[in-house]
């Protein structure tokens, strides 16, 4: 089921903080199953003898993917709040990062069952799982050890890599339109101040 092409393939893994009791692991990957051409997050249960994964549950599907696999993102991480955070890539498609109805170029925050977590800021016309938008290709999420504040790290276009403090409903500012204009700055603080 893993479609390993270009920047796509096995993209990320998170172990449930309650693993000792529920044995859940979460895997992000590029999928070609039954003609699918997306990135997705799947929850599995790891057998006690560590020999097999069972109880597959595709929690987040339809994360945008292009044939080269470029900007697939898909980095899952549990936060200190107990929710699963997932950084997604924009699939090198200019309209994805600022579109609240599309999961590309976002940070998602979900429950163990794949639903939008309480406290996500619903953007007009938006998807309930979106925590922030306006990202290019999130490669990591980290949490402050004392305050629990969330931060993302992402690649810029040959320069301009950035770390962004994440706030519910926030906008990281990546907006490479028209087309996919990579000469624009990663963050336009005038247009997207949060």
Tell me the role of every PLM-derived stretch.
Residues 1-94, 140-143, 147-156:
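Acidic, Gly/Ser/Thr-rich repeat motifs that build Ca2+-stabilized beta-propeller blades
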């Amino acid at each position: 089921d893993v479609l390993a092409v270009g920047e796509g393939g096995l993209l990320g893994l998170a172990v449930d903080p309650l693993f000792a009791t529920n044995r859940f692991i979460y895997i992000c990957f590029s999928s070609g199953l039954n003609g699918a051409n997306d990135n997705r997050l799947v929850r599995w249960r790891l057998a006690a003898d560590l020999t097999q994964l069972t109880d597959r549950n595709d929690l987040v599907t339809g994360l945008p993917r292009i044939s080269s696999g470029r900007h697939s993102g898909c980095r899952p991480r549990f936060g200190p709040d107990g929710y699963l955070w997932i950084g997604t890539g924009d699939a090198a498609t200019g309209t994805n990062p600022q579109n609240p109805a599309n999961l590309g170029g976002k940070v998602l925050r979900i429950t163990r069952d794949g639903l939008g977590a309480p406290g996500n800021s619903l953007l007009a016309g938006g998807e309930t799982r979106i925590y922030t938008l306006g990202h290019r290709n999130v490669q990591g999420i980290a949490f402050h050890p004392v305050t629990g504040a969330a931060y993302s790290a992402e690649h810029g276009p040959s320069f301009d890599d950035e770390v962004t403090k994440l706030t519910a409903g926030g906008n990281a500012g990546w907006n490479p339109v028209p087309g996919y204009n990579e000469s624009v700055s990663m963050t336009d603080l005038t247009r997207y101040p949060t």
